[in-house]
Amino acid sequence: MASSDGDRLCRSNAVRRKTTPSYSGQYRTARRSVVVGPPDDSDDSLGYITTVGADSPSPVYADLYFEHKNTTPRVHQPNDSSGSEDDFEDIDEVVAAFREARLRHELVEDAVYENPLSVEKPSRSFTKNAAVKPKLEDSPKRAPPGAGAIASGRPISFSTAPKTATSSWCGPTPSYNKRVFCEAVRRVAAMQAQKAAEAAWNSNPPRNNAELDRLLTGAVIRITVHEGLNLIQAANEADLGEGASVSKRGHNRKTGDLQGGMGNEPMYAQVRKPKSRTDTQTTGRITNRSRARSASRTDARK
């Protein structure tokens, strides 16, 4: 009976001295707790002292376990700055704090995905399909057809490129040509209005508000345009500041695209209407041959 008590006492002391590695990689003293075992007739029924923990061996294999553990002795290095032997309780605090932080994170994620407007959604680096990507609110919009060519400052021209070789104009081509046509009319109108205003002002400069009103009433420009390539040429020359050649060429023609007014009358732009539908179609298209022909005519007139 004495031997069994001695074995239990040795086992208790050995377990009390056992150290377990902490989360930081250093050894700490295991926490001790009293467990009352089953009553025994050989002792005073106070039980024995052991340790409850994950690394604690069962009482049956305790002797073999500690005999193996004692082959590699370990040096106890307390990690508690207070110097107490039992410093394993702070691990419970760390685990509790970790669980609390994880719970808060899960609650935030649930709130985000249940109500995206309440909390800002975390940005995702990529998506499987590019079409699923949300559009940026401040992303620049695509310019309408023809706006880029007009804003670039290059000479404008109609587009004659159909979608296929045999089909009629389709896709963005009509919108492009409409915008180019309106821009050409605007430039020609601005050039004519400038010349008419200068002529009216030079003929009789206004000296008061009443004369200015009469001048503005008489200087109203009635805008008409000439068809096809002449409109684009006039618009490009007006944009490049070569309106003098346009007016000179207009006076030399029989009908005259641009005619000067007599006296105080402003200059008006007159139009030569096409005779048939085929003329409209042929004049509306611009080719390299027509450009070369118009350039040769201009050189011959000069």
UniProtKB/Swiss-Prot annotation:
Keywords: Host cytoplasm, Host Golgi apparatus, Host nucleus, Host-virus interaction, Inhibition of host innate immune response by virus, Phosphoprotein, Viral immunoevasion, Virion, Virion tegument. Residues 1-42, 125-167, 243-302 are annotated as: Disordered. Residues 157-167 have a biased composition (Polar residues). The keyword rRNA-binding does not apply. Transmembrane segments: none annotated. It comes from the Viruses. One of its GO terms (biological process) is symbiont-mediated suppression of host innate immune response. Residues 154-244 are annotated as: Interaction with gE. A motif (Nuclear export signal) lies at residues 212-224. Residues 1-10 have a biased composition (Basic and acidic residues). Coiled coil: none annotated. Highly phosphorylated in the host cell. Packaging is selective for underphosphorylated forms. GO terms for cellular component: host cell Golgi apparatus; host cell nucleus; viral tegument. It is found in: Virion tegument; Host cytoplasm; Host nucleus; Host Golgi apparatus. InterPro entries: Herpes_UL49. Belongs to the alphaherpesvirinae VP22 tegument protein family. Interacts with gE (via C-terminus); this interaction is necessary for the recruitment of VP22/ORF9 to the Golgi and its packaging into virions. Interacts with gM (via C-terminus). Interacts with VP16/ORF10; this interaction allows the formation of a tripartite complex composed of VP16/ORF10, VP22/ORF9 and VHS/ORF17. Interacts with the capsid-binding protein ORF44. Interacts with host CGAS. Tegument protein that plays different roles during the time course of infection. Participates in both the accumulation of viral mRNAs and viral protein translation at late time of infection. Modulates the RNase activity of the virion host shutoff protein ORF17 probably to ensure necessary levels of key cellular mRNAs and proteins. Plays a role in microtubule reorganization that occurs after viral infection by stabilizing microtubule network. This is Tegument protein VP22. It comes from Varicella-zoster virus (strain Oka vaccine).
